[in-house]
Amino acid sequence: MLYLVEMTVNVPHGISPELLEQMKIEEKQRAKELQESGHWKHLWRVVGRYANVSIFDVDSHDELHTLLSSLPLFPLMDIRVTALAKHPSTI
């Protein structure tokens, strides 16, 4: 199942710069693991925002939730998920 996932990171005022940097390092590693496993198919940065647009390929809604909640920055994110289906005009 393919999903369009839009993630926006909201950095809380007053967060320790060291904690945020550590979370970013861990986030990058986890994102790499999910891409290498084939679950995180595409990842694009949104210009001018601390956000991304991604395509995930997973077996279920529950699996997607598990993967997204495993991201170290998950507690700081607003996430919008859209399930995708093949378009009848696709060639």
Give the ranges of each region predicted by the language model.
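Conserved, structured core segments of small domains
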Residues: 1-91
